[in-house]
C-alpha cells in the first residue's frame, strides 16, 4: 500500500513537472521571440540572471494558481475539472504577466502574442490532461472498497461514490448485523480501503482503531461533533493533550480584519461592476416592466434579520401564495433573463451593497430565509450553528457543495469553515468562487423529490 502511494505521488510529480515546463516554455517563446527584442530598442538589456528571474516569477505564480485551483490534481479531480482549473490559472497568471512586462516596457504592450501563447497553452493543456489521466488510470485503477453500514439505506452513499467511478469501486457491502468478527475478517482481505457509513459512534471508533492499527485506509463521513472537534485548538498546558473549542467563532482581531477586507473589496467591486449592473437593470425592466431589484428577508449572525438585495430573476408573482420555497429544477417561475443571470451569478451583484452596509460578509454561510430556517430547525436544531458568524455572499458550502446539497451536509461544510477560519481561507475561497461561476451543477435547483432536511441525519450525531 505504501509503495502504491509513493508511486502515485512520484507519477503526479512527474506529470505536473512536464505540464509546468511546457507552460513556461510557451512563455519563454513569446518573451525571447517578441517582447525582449522590443525592450532592447529602448536600451534595456537583461543578462542571463535577468532572463532567469523573469521566467522564475512566471513559474512560481503559475504553480501557486495551479495549486490553488487544482490544475495539477491529475487523478484526483475529473479531467474536465482539471482543464477548467488550468484555464482559470492561465488566465490569472497571463494577465498578471502581461502587466509585469508592461511595467518593464514602460507602457502598455501589444497583447496579441499573449493571446497566441494562451491558445497554444490551452491546446497543450487539453492534450496533456487527456494523456496524463489515461496513463494514471492505466497504472492506478479505481480503488476497490468495502462498505460497512448501519441500518440506514445505502442508496445515497452508493450514488455518491458511483459519481467517481474513475477513483472508487465499492465491490462489497456489509451491515453491522454481520458481527464484529466477520467485519474484522473481511477488512483483512486486501481492499483498497474501507468506507464507514451510518455507524453509531462507539462502533465506528472501534472499527477505526482496528483499521488504524493495521494500516487500512478509512473513508468516513464526519458527524457534526467530529467537525467541531477537528477545528478545535490544541493546548499544551499539562502532560496530556487538551482541545479547546472557543465560545465565539471568530476573535476580535479576526472580525476587524474581515470587516476591513469587506469594505475595501466591496467598494472596488461596486465600481468595477457598476456598468454590468446598469445593463442588467435596464434589461430586466424592459423585459416585463417589473421591479429591477428583489428584496427578501434573510438571517445573518445571531439570527438577526436583514433585507438581502438581488436582481429579480423570477416572475413578479412568483410567491403570490405567500409560501416560501426554494427554486426547483426547471422552475417555471424563473424568467429567461433570470435563468441567464442566475447561471453567471449576476443576480447576486446587488449584495455588494449588503456587504458594504455590514449586513453580510464576502465569505460565510449563505443567509437563509426565516421560514426555511424554521423548517430546518424542527428536524435539525444544529442548523442554528451556522449563525455563529456573519452570512456571506459565498462560502465553503458553495465552493465544495451544490445548490441542492442537503442542509445537513451544508451545515457540516459551513461548520468546517467556521471552525477553521483564517484570513487566508477567506482569500482562498474568494478566488475559488470565481471557478464555480462556470460549474453548472452549482446552480442547479432543488429536486422536488429530494429530502432536504433529514431528521435521521441529525439523530445520528447523538448515537
Roles of regions detected by a PLM:
Residues 382-463:
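C-terminal terminal-structure detector
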Residues 2, 6, 44, 71-75, ...:
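Juxtamembrane loop-helix boundary motifs flanking transmembrane segments in multi-pass membrane proteins
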Residues 254-317, 354, 429-463:
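A hydrophobic, helix-centered structural microdomain
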Residues 1-23, 27, 130-274, 444-463:
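N-terminal hydrophobic signal-anchor/signal peptide
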Residues 86, 90, 142-157, 291-314, ...:
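Membrane-cytosol interface motif
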Residues 328-390, 429-433:
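A short, structured surface patch at a secondary-structure boundary
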Residues 225-226, 232-233, 294-333, 394-412:
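Short, glycine-rich, amphipathic interfacial segments at transmembrane boundaries or analogous
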Residues 1-138, 438:
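Signature of alpha-helical transmembrane segments in polytopic membrane proteins
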